């Protein structure tokens, strides 16, 4: 597997001279980016460009990612880390914990400064004109994207139209602009960028994978408009009727506007057309050509497991992925999601067994018939936690002859691709020398090292449990719910007891499935249910599920649910939660749908991980970790108090 990107490696190195301690509201230029050495030649231009990307938040840095492990999808054994302040509700204006406010405005300033230098004749000797125009378009994209990230956090924001004037008086500092004006500005930036960017970066540009494209610009415009149409931002007078600037101007739209859904739908259709014309398609069974681990064997499960880990150099786009439109190709590092998710290595290190899906999330995944477990009339929901012996008919789901809960059987392929459960499988290779799992009697490794998987046992004393017995329970590196995450862990990884092995897969920021489901959501809200189901079913089909209308008519307790606006809305939302599990969506989607208070303000539930037998283990219990969400305050992020104090024109987010 070819791991990219050299561009982002350079980006991180180049960013070192730009991440200064001053903030945007101080309007102080970064002195270290001035001087002829920064504008002398083509390499200087490339370094400057990469420095502009250096302000992208790291989406998969577990300890410090705002939206990664902070929804209700998982609970972890790492609640001492910085991110845990958010699900616990322990953040405020005086202590925002993780804040984008200053960093992203620094990034915006850096982009405008680079644009200014690109527009000066004589700068960057040897830089071809086509590259100069491409760089201009890329930083225009980043200006739009950084404003988008800010608006997602804070709603109405300060709009930056040009390089800030270092001589600006505090009395002339800007305040926030009305939210709809912010949306228009961001969309204009994406439109402008799309005109100057290539649709893909392939062939000789393969080392540029991760840089902006016109398809990414169109996709991000659609995403911005989706947020603008959503309940949090569209006519939410209950929360924001008093959200006004210092002059009394209303900052949030207080009247619902259904046409915003139509506008977003048009943008999604434009992005989909551009993406498909550029060759993007949903990663499916025919794309899964990796020749290493033979597990998972089921073709649907296998394709889903590799959907966001296969960036094989065998692809037509070297190092690319047929579905991922834009990715962050910085590596996650030793303390990333892979090592934190992998089954525990007794007598070793680097596999910490600690990213645990919650029962709330696990219950969202469908049955094999493509319905929620409480809506499928063929699923024994009332007795779902009963332990049963696995028979040969379910051998691809769990190990025959051993026991698991009914809850884990007859589920959809995504469940088996991304979740490990009692006596189910964790597909991972064990290194030929000093192998991580080779000595475990529950591990299968063929003689040619091509098929490797672990049978997971979470009952106390088992290989994935909290400890070997009741007297040696670990206080870290354990699953708090009795389940483990498999998403983003490459089955081809050959793990040794030293635990240093992990793959630096690019991280999807937006992929084609998100365009299909975003379009379906917008169409459903405008009443076009037929086409909404059409695009919803594209994602369901790839997941190995029947069409939504067929599934409900044949297996649903409410056979007509997929034919009503309210029913289809609920179905599409659930589909997003399943498809984008652990992809930085849950934290924001629950907010924009105004559902965060319902789902983020409840105790996490899991199985009895202190049990010493399967019957006791099958009891559902509350996990000890605190969860708190205060409405309406926590729907948006707080602006740091220090910045409010520096700029008298900025008003604080309501509630903080």
PLM-predicted stretches and their roles:
Residues 22-70, 406-409, 640-656:
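Membrane-proximal, proline-rich intrinsically disordered regions
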Residues 104, 185-187, 208, 225-226, ...:
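Long, intrinsically disordered, low-complexity segments
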Residues 1-30:
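Bacterial Sec-dependent N-terminal signal peptides
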Residues 41-59, 79-155, 168-209, 214, ...:
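Conserved, well-structured interaction surfaces
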Residues 98, 393-542:
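C-terminal substrate/ligand-recognition segments
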Residues 151-152, 156-158, 201, 227-236, ...:
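Short coil/turn linking the two alpha-helices of tandem helical-hairpin repeats
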Residues 300-458:
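Glycine-rich, aromatic-lined ligand/substrate-binding cores of catalytic
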């Amino acid at each position: 597997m070819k791991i990219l990107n050299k561009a982002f490696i350079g980006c991180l190195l180049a960013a070192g001279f730009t991440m200064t301690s001053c903030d945007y509201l101080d309007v102080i230029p970064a002195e270290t980016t001035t001087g002829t050495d920064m504008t002398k030649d083509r390499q200087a231009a490339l370094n400057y460009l990469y420095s502009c990307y250096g302000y992208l938040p790291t989406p998969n840095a577990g300890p410090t990612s705002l939206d990664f492990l902070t929804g209700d999808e998982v609970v972890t054994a790492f609640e001492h880390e910085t991110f845990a302040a958010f699900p616990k509700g322990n953040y405020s204006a005086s202590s925002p914990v993780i804040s984008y406010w200053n960093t992203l405005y620094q990034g915006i300033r850096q982009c405008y400064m680079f644009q200014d230098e690109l527009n000066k004749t004589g700068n960057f000797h040897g830089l071809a004109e086509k590259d100069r125009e491409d760089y201009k378009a890329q930083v225009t994209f980043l200006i739009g994207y950084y404003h988008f990230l800010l608006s997602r956090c804070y709603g109405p924001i300060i709009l930056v139209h040009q390089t800030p004037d270092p001589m600006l008086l505090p009395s002339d500092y800007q305040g926030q602009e009305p939210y709809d004006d912010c949306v228009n500005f961001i969309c204009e930036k994406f439109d402008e960028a799309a005109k100057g960017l290539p649709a893909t970066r392939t062939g000789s540009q393969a080392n540029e994978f991760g840089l902006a494209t016109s398809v990414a610009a169109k996709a991000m415009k659609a995403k911005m408009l989706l947020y603008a149409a959503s309940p949090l931002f569209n006519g939410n007078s209950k929360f924001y009727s008093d959200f006004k600037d210092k002059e009394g101007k209303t900052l949030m739209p207080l009247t619902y506007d259904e046409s915003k859904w139509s506008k977003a739908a048009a943008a999604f259709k434009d992005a989909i057309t551009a993406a498909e014309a550029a060759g993007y398609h949903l990663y499916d069974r025919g794309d899964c050509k990796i020749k290493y681990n033979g597990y998972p064997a089921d073709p649907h499960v296998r394709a889903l497991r590799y959907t966001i880990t296969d960036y094989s150099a065998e692809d037509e786009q070297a190092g690319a992925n047929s579905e991922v439109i834009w990715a962050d190709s910085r590596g996650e590092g030793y303390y990333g999601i892979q090592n934190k998710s992998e089954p525990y290595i007794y007598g070793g290190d680097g596999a910490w067994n600690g990213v645990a899906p919650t029962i709330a999330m696990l219950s969202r995944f469908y049955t094999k018939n493509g319905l929620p477990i409480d809506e499928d009339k063929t699923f024994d929901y009332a007795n779902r936690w009963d332990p049963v012996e696995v028979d040969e008919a379910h051998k691809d789901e769990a190990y025959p002859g051993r026991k698991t809960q009914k809850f884990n059987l007859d589920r959809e392929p995504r469940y088996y691709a991304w979740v490990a459960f009692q006596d189910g499988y964790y597909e991972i290779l064990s290194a030929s020398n000093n192998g991580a799992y080779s000595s475990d009697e529950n591990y299968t490794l063929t003689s040619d090292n091509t098929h490797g998987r672990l049978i997971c046992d979470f009952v106390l004393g088992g290989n994935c449990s909290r400890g070997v017995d009741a007297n040696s329970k670990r206080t870290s590196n354990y699953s708090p719910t009795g389940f483990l995450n498999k998403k983003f862990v490459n089955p081809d990884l050959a793990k040794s007891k030293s635990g240093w092995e992990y793959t630096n897969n690019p991280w999807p920021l937006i992929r084609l499935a998100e365009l299909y489901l975003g379009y379906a959501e917008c169409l459903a809200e405008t009443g076009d249910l037929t086409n909404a189901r059409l695009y919803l079913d594209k994602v369901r089909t790839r997941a190995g599920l029947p069409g939504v209308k067929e599934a409900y008519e044949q297996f649903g307790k409410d056979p007509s649910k997929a034919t009503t606006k309210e029913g289809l809305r609920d179905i599409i939302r659930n589909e997003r939660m399943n498809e984008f599990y652990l992809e930085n969506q849950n934290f924001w989607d629950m907010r924009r749908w105004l559902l965060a208070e319902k789902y983020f303000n409840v105790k996490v539930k899991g199985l009895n991980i202190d049990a010493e037998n399967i019957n006791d283990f099958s009891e559902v219990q509350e996990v000890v970790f605190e969860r708190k969400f205060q409405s309406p305050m926590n729907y948006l992020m707080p602006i740091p108090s220090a910045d409010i104090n520096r700029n008298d024109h900025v008003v604080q987010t309501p509630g903080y």
